[in-house]
Structure formats: C-alpha cells, structure tokens
Swiss-Prot record:
It comes from Carica papaya (Papaya). InterPro entries: Ribosomal_uS19 (IPR002222), Ribosomal_uS19_bac-type (IPR005732), Ribosomal_uS19_CS (IPR020934), Ribosomal_uS19_SF (IPR023575). Protein S19 forms a complex with S13 that binds strongly to the 16S ribosomal RNA. GO terms for biological process: ribosomal small subunit assembly; translation. It is found in: Plastid, Chloroplast. This is Small ribosomal subunit protein uS19c. The keyword Chloroplast applies. GO terms for cellular component: chloroplast; mitochondrial small ribosomal subunit. It comes from the Eukaryota. Pfam families: Ribosomal_S19. Its main location: plastid. The gene is rps19. Keywords: Chloroplast, Plastid, Ribonucleoprotein, Ribosomal protein, RNA-binding, rRNA-binding. Disulfide bonds: none annotated.
Amino acid sequence: MTRSLKKNPFVANHLLRKIEKLNTKAEKEIIITWSRASTIIPTMIGHTIAIHNGREHLPVYITDRMVGHKLGEFAPTINFRGHAKNDNKSRR
C-alpha cells in the first residue's frame, strides 16, 4: 500500500538538516546514514549518501531518476550466492 498523498514524504530530520547545510555551503561530501526508510527528495540530487545495509555503509550517488524511492532500495541487505549445485543429501 502506498503512502497517502495528503501526507508528505518521510525524510529523517537529521538527514534533512545535513543536506540543507551542505546545500547552503554548496559543498559535496559523503553523508553517512542509517535511515533506509527516508524518501529521496529533489534537494538530495547530486549528493553521495552512504546507506547502511546491516554490515557497512554503501555509498550511493543520488540522481534525478531516484526521486520518490526509498534510500534502502539502493543498498541490498542480502547477498544471494545461488542455489546449491549438487545437494544430494536434501533429496533423501
């Protein structure tokens, strides 16, 4: 179910403050965050945000095509290694 249009998109306050501070200074530096639920808004375009995936922070460069998506969509938490090639024990 999608978020109601009456509500604004969720962006963590600490993340929003960091981005606004960098926009006023016109600086570009990596912003580290644990907030995977924050929605990407147009003021984030051009910044690099390091998103936590449970183990490390993955740097993601924000482009205009990412607006409206959540930050967590761009930092996968599980690495699928593929199915077992020859698993005869589980067949028994």
